[in-house]
């Protein structure tokens, strides 16, 4: 009995010690939201207040001090997120998570994001404000790495904390740019459809097919392969966005109202990091990406800006003809050129490093050797604007975050080549605007970038990049509002821009609501953000019903339940309220219609 008592007492003591150790560890790991923290390199004291949501409000007498403090508090809240994001574009996830991520690393390493980042860093002017504030931000991150507690994720994965550098900012932006792209999912699929079913099938899909564009029957599998690789990435994807800016003539108080709702997959921690910074020369309440110093969405007392994805086509695929008997050369402009070959190494946790070769043409990397499951017979190379053109995105983000007015803001946008963005703007002077930022380009007549192109010569090459002034935009339109929902822009000077724009459903609803009302206020705009009515699907119901009635002789008699379902869906107003059943019936109907047709 005494022995049992001793055992029980021992177990209780051990349990208490474990609990105490856990509480001490938890307290050690908790971010510091009160007290004083010594941070070397500050010129003066910086005050940081955290509100009830944990959002930092940073007050400093210089921008350099403010951005250094931002880097520190950003790191104490999100260091592991920063670590993961900087590794994705560089192809270094396998170092953290092991062999399961090798193919994902191979994809991103081969895309050339890391190499493009190195070039961008080399081109930065070290005397520029964008460079100096970026370095101040990185100094803050690295100060936390040196003196702050180690996040538990580093301990669990056995990962050593290492200092951040400028290249990491670009690698994070590069991953985000690729995650927004759609061509790698769509172009091969359309080429495969043409190969299997012919051009008539594509006409039914409202896709223009250029007979000069090659249909590559051997290029099968990459869509699913790349999609599955992206799904393994431990970071959420952008899945669409809404934004609108209402001019002073359509609001109750005569001031501009700005609304932006980026649709990003749920994640913990969230993609955005909110922070408010105030100095004598700078103030913004902004939303930052992990590891990026300047906000992508922000507002201050003078202006507000935000974004949606433009969805333009900035990735092209080119078929490549190899020399008979010599797979080390390919045909371009009637010459046989050697592939540029680079050896890459992927470090893998608890395993030997993986070495592989990346072959490149004048267009970019050969994808067949990168994505498992792709037929090797005909090489396909990928040309991506992000890595092809000089990248000035960091400078542009600095300039838009420091803009004093609309002209200043607009002039800052031309350096954003990829990803394509719809940048929304409103200011206290009553100006509203929308600009599409992207490096758009001309192609030869009749060439469609929605298919795999002929890479043997210049007949399907980019002719030239268009000046930013020719990009779609709208500044202070007479109807007094601008909006974007990832929808296609109207032609500019008769010119359309190829892209993977989303259906008009959201855009049409936004336009209908904005057009019908002239007394908007904060409350009504907030209600609009959560609107759940489709402006398109009720019209589709009418077409479905018309088609069904035209085939009445082929349709068996309906049961009472079926007839009630028909009546329910016919009276549907497009609402997706929780108690609404017609919306569920519509999508079930739509599913079988698409499946069978």
Annotated model-derived regions:
Residues 12, 43-48, 393-415:
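Alpha/propeptide regions of enzymes that mature by internal proteolysis
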Residues 1-17:
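N-terminal Sec-pathway targeting helices
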Residues 283-284, 289-354, 400:
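Compact, glycine/acidic-enriched structural inserts
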Residues 59, 67-68, 254-255, 266-269, ...:
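Short helix/loop capping segments that flank catalytic or ligand/cofactor-binding pockets
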Residues 66-69, 116-132, 383, 394-400, ...:
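Second-shell loop/turn segments in exported
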Residues 390, 404-410, 417, 495-597:
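Ordered core of a single globular domain
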Residues 20-257, 262-265, 281, 286, ...:
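Substrate-recognition/specificity elements adjacent to catalytic centers across diverse enzyme folds
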Residues 418-517, 593-595:
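Hydrophobic alpha-helical segments
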């Amino acid at each position: 009995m005494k022995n049992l008592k001793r055992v029980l007492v021992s177990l209780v003591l051990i349990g208490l010690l474990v609990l105490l150790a856990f509480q001490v560890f938890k307290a050690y790991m908790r971010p510091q939201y009160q007290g004083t923290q010594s941070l070397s390199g500050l010129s003066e004291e910086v005050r940081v207040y955290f509100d009830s949501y944990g959002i930092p409000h940073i007050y400093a007498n210089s921008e350099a001090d403010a951005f250094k403090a931002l880097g520190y508090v950003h790191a104490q809240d999100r260091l592991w997120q920063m670590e993961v994001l900087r590794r994705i574009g560089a192809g270094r996830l396998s170092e953290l998570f092991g062999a399961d991520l090798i193919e994902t690393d191979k994809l991103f390493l081969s895309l050339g994001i890391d190499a493009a980042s190195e070039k961008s860093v080399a081109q930065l002017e070290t005397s520029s404000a964008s460079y100096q504030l970026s370095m101040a931000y990185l100094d803050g991150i690295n100060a936390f790495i040196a003196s702050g507690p180690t996040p538990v994720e580093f301990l669990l994965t056995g990962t050593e904390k290492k200092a951040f550098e400028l290249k990491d900012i670009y690698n994070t932006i590069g991953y985000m740019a690729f995650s927004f792209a759609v061509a790698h999912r769509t172009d091969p699929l359309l080429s495969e459809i043409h190969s299997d079913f012919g051009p008539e099938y594509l006409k039914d899909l409202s896709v223009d097919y250029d007979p000069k564009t090659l249909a590559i029957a051997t290029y099968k599998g990459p869509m699913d392969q790349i999609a599955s690789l992206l799904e393994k990435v431990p970071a959420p994807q952008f899945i669409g966005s809404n934004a609108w800016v209402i001019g002073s003539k359509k609001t109750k108080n005569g001031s501009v109202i700005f609304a932006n709702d980026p649709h990003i997959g749920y994640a913990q921690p969230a993609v955005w990091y909110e922070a408010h910074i105030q100095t004598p020369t700078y103030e913004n309440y902004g939303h930052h990406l992990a590891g990026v110093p300047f906000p992508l969405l922000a507002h201050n007392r003078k202006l507000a800006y935000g974004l949606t994805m433009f969805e333009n086509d900035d990735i092209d695929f080119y078929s490549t003809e190899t020399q008979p008997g010599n797979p080390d050369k390919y045909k371009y402009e009637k010459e046989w050129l050697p592939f540029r070959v680079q050896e890459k190494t992927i470090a893998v946790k608890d395993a030997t490093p993986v070495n592989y070769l990346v072959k490149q043409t004048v267009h970019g990397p050969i994808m067949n050797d990168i994505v498992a499951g792709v037929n090797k017979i005909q090489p396909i190379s990928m040309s991506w604007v992000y890595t092809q053109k000089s990248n000035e995105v960091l400078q542009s983000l600095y300039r838009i975050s420091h803009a004093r007015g609309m002209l200043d803001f607009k002039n800052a946008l031309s350096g954003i080549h990829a990803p394509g963005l719809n940048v929304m703007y409103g200011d206290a002077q009553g100006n509203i605007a929308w600009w599409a930022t992207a490096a758009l380009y001309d192609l030869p007549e009749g060439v469609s970038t929605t298919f795999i192109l002929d890479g043997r010569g210049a007949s399907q090459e980019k002719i030239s990049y268009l000046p930013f002034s020719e990009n779609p935009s709208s500044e202070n339109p007479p109807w007094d509002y601008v909006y974007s929902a990832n929808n296609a822009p109207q032609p500019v000077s008769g010119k359309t821009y190829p892209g993977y724009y989303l259906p008009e459903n959201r855009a049409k609803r936004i336009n209908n609501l904005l057009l019908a009302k002239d007394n908007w206020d904060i409350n009504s705009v907030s209600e609009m953000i959560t609107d759940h009515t489709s402006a398109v699907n009720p019209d589709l119901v009418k077409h479905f019903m018309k088609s069904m009635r035209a085939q009445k002789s082929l349709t068996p008699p309906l049961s009472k339940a079926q007839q009630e379902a028909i009546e329910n869906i016919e009276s549907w107003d497009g609402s997706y309220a929780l108690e609404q059943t017609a919306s569920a019936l519509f999508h079930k109907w739509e599913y079988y219609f698409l499946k069978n047709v």
